Swiss-Prot record:
Belongs to the RNA methyltransferase RlmH family. The gene is rlmH. GO terms for molecular function: rRNA (pseudouridine-N3-)-methyltransferase activity. Keywords: Cytoplasm, Methyltransferase, rRNA processing, S-adenosyl-L-methionine, Transferase. It catalyses: pseudouridine(1915) in 23S rRNA + S-adenosyl-L-methionine = N(3)-methylpseudouridine(1915) in 23S rRNA + S-adenosyl-L-homocysteine + H(+). It comes from Psychromonas ingrahamii (strain DSM 17664 / CCUG 51855 / 37). It comes from the Bacteria. PANTHER family: METHYLTRANSFERASE, RIBOSOMAL RNA LARGE SUBUNIT METHYLTRANSFERASE H. The keyword S-adenosyl-L-methionine applies. This is Ribosomal RNA large subunit methyltransferase H. Its EC number is 2.1.1.177.
């Protein structure tokens, strides 16, 4: 199974790339984690945020391979413990589809992305910076994966 993290925004700080790669490289070939970055619209003093969000949504949806299960990351989604995430990942594997996890930009995800999602996941009720979310998601997925294979990474 491949988990494709589709995230709005490019040119992330070096620590974001290093943090994400630290966990992505730990996955085995049968459970790959891949990052696809979507160009964020240019924001300025007089930017039309609705238009920018719509364009980001179109680019995000166009990047999703046909047949992938779409999971959005948003504050109104379902909060999972590590054990629950491991269970969800097990269900994803049984579904025999690849996963596209969508992360929005500074204003979140376009409504069209949320409408198309089959599942909604909330990392926290807190507002998190979208670059940090990449690292948290990669680590959370890796931690949950290690539970499914009885690897000692996760401690209770």
């Amino acid at each position: 199974m491949k988990i494709q993290l589709i995230a709005v925004g490019t040119k992330m700080p070096d620590w974001v790339e290093k943090g994400y790669q630290e966990y992505a490289r730990r996955f085995p070939k049968e459970m790959q984690l891949e990052l696809l970055e979507i160009n964020a619209g240019k924001r300025g003093k007089n930017a039309d945020i609705k238009r920018i969000l719509k364009k980001e949504g179109e680019l995000t949806l166009a990047a999703i391979p046909k047949g992938n299960k779409i999971v959005t990351l948003e504050v109104t989604g379902q909060a999972w413990t590590t054990e629950q995430l491991a269970d969800e990942m097990g269900k994803w594997q049984l579904d025999a589809r690849n996963i596209s996890l969508l992360i929005g930009g500074p204003e979140g995800l376009a409504p069209e992305c949320i409408t198309k999602s089959e599942q909604r996941w909330s990392l926290s009720a807190l507002t998190l910076p979208h670059p940090l979310v990449r690292v948290i998601v990669a680590e959370s997925l890796y931690r949950a994966f290690t539970l499914t294979i009885n690897h000692p990474y996760h401690r209770e």
